């Protein structure tokens, strides 16, 4: 310890002595502090590469893609907590989870987007509570009994419910489409929870939802995030994928977003995710719905509404793939590449370049040159 102190003391003295030399102008050819420096240096234009830059200096941590029991998938597989619980948990409160465990974050988040699926939002809370209209339907009563039984029966009910919705056989009597009292109630609950727990300069509770396009089992999901509060977000209910009120085409989602902004004066953005489960249609060079090549209008519209991309999440990493980045030792991180979202179609190697973020950037640069963006 003494030797260490001696070394530190020696270093400190050396620095002080060297500093005194500079101040005095000794041996380094600098003018003394009392003399003018005019004419001592060659004239030149001053330049700093960092002058004028205004980069953020504070990092905020949060989640832009969280589902609660209001969502069709999370609710199907046992989530019982709602939007208020999600915001409380994000702010650092201790909760009892849907499995009965006490849970708490090690560090509270700075922001959260509760992004429950817009299709059939609020279905599972109604089913789990034994809603009279649900139980009056034979299928609804059977699903209720299966979910209450839990275990393998509950899992079987979840799979059956999701498959029936995906295949278009979901009973109309059990649906919660936009415009229905049940849907309005669910959306109001989501909005009010965000408003209640939003605390400016401390915690930001964003209003949002997930638009869940799953054409042919191919994932084109987007999380839609509002930059607005209740007064604007409540004017229009979320966009869904089922016709005639909705669509599974991203262009139609962007049109809806434009209508919202024109009608309310508000602002929206969308964040796509899991291109790795799209089977080559998340970042294509031709329109997967029409087969047409993209034009300038498409490029500008997508860039406007989708400035961000969710590069990784629980259903696999979306940054790159070992076949696309063979020299990157981390390219095989959490790779999901067996097929599309529901595994109804297998993955082919020629699909990969249109699924991942790195090659999406390359494709974007290519389209930029071709379209003059």
Model-derived features with residue positions:
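Bacterial N-terminal signal peptides that target proteins for export
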Residues: 1-8
């Amino acid at each position: 310890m003494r030797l260490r102190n001696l070394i530190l003391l020696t270093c400190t003295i050396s620095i002080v002595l060297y500093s005194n030399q500079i101040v005095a102008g000794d041996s380094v050819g600098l003018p003394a502090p009392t003399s003018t420096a005019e004419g001592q240096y060659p004239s030149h234009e001053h330049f700093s590469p960092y002058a004028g830059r205004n980069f953020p200096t504070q990092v905020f941590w949060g989640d832009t893609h969280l589902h609660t029991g209001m969502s069709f998938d999370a609710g199907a597989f046992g989530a019982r907590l709602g939007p208020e619980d999600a915001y409380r948990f994000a702010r650092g409160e201790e909760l009892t989870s849907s499995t009965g465990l006490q849970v708490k974050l090690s560090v509270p988040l700075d922001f959260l987007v509760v992004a429950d699926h817009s299709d059939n939002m609020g279905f599972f809370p109604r089913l789990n509570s034994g809603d009279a209209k649900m139980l009056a339907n034979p299928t609804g009563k059977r699903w209720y009994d299966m979910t209450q039984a839990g275990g393998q029966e509950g899992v079987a009910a979840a799979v059956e419910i999701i498959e029936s919705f995906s295949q278009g056989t979901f009973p109309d009597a059990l649906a919660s489409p936009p415009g229905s009292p049940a849907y309005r109630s669910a959306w109001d609950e989501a909005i009010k929870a965000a408003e209640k727990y939003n605390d400016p300069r401390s915690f930001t509770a964003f209003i949002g939802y997930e638009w869940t396009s799953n054409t042919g089992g191919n994932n084109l999901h987007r999380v839609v995030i509002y930059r607005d509060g209740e007064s604007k977000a409540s004017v229009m209910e979320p966009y869904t994928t089922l016709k005639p009120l909705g669509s599974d085409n991203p262009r139609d989602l962007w049109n809806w977003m434009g209508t919202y902004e024109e009608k309310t004066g508000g602002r929206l953005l969308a964040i796509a995710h899991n291109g790795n489960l799209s089977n080559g249609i998340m970042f294509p060079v031709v329109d997967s719905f029409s087969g047409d090549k993209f034009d300038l209008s498409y490029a500008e519209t997508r860039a406007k509404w989708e400035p961000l991309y969710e590069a990784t999440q629980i259903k696999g990493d979306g940054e790159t793939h070992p076949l696309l980045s063979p020299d990157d030792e981390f390219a095989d991180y959490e790779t999901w590449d067996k097929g599309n979202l529901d595994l109804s179609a297998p993955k082919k190697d020629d699909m990969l370049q249109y699924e991942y973020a790195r090659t999406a950037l390359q494709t974007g640069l290519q389209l930029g040159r071709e379209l003059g963006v």
